[in-house]
Design a protein with these regions (language model features):
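In a subset of proteins, long, contiguous C-terminal domains/tails are tracked
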Residues: 115-171
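Proteins synthesized as precursors that undergo proteolytic processing into mature forms
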Residues: 1-134
Length: 171
């Protein structure tokens, strides 16, 4: 559940609080509006392959999912290797959650990101903070892929993120 506005008798969903009351804001509350909210599940397909990803993590969701997809597609990492790889997250834009804080040029990196890469971020003007490895706040990507093997048989593979309690099960 979410907060209750007793004077109006309205129960706000946890994601409903991501809307804005300012009439000029693109994510304003309005009749028929389609508010932007942070959940961002992904289904990707190519030929006989299909791939699904999802992640809890508020403002980090899209960043975490994109990093996992990038690792799989560009480095050939397995799904499990990709979800376990160190992450970074930017907090430069206003948070989706009230009171919508932002931190100019703030980037958090997990401990597994090497110091040389952190120095490169600092050289570009970022303020870099280091999270421990497998930081809860870095999101928790769960993923499963269905693809044919060399014999044309369907094979399911999964990745379960150790940052939170997660399992990869398929049938």
């Amino acid at each position: 559940g979410g907060p209750i506005i007793p004077e109006l008798g309205i129960l706000c969903s946890p994601r409903g609080v991501q809307s804005r009351l300012s009439s000029s804001h693109p994510n304003r509350v309005r009749p028929g509006g389609r508010p932007v909210v942070t959940p961002a599940p992904v289904i990707a397909t190519r030929g006989d392959e299909s791939w699904a990803l999802a992640c809890p993590g508020g403002d980090v969701i899209v960043q975490a999912v994109a990093q996992v997809m990038w690792r799989v597609m560009t480095t050939g990492a397995s799904l499990q290797e990709a979800v376990e790889a160190p992450r970074f997250a930017s907090f430069n834009v206003p948070s989706a959650f009230h009171p919508h804080p932002s931190a100019d040029r703030l980037v958090y990196t997990e401990g597994g990101i090497n110091e040389r890469e952190r120095e490169q971020l600092r050289a570009q003007g970022h303020h870099v903070e280091v999270w421990p490895n497998f930081e809860f706040d870095a999101g928790s990507v769960q993923t499963i892929r269905s693809a044919p093997n060399s014999q044309g048989e369907r094979v399911l593979t999964a990745g379960a993120d150790p940052r939170r309690l997660a399992y990869g099960l398929a049938r």
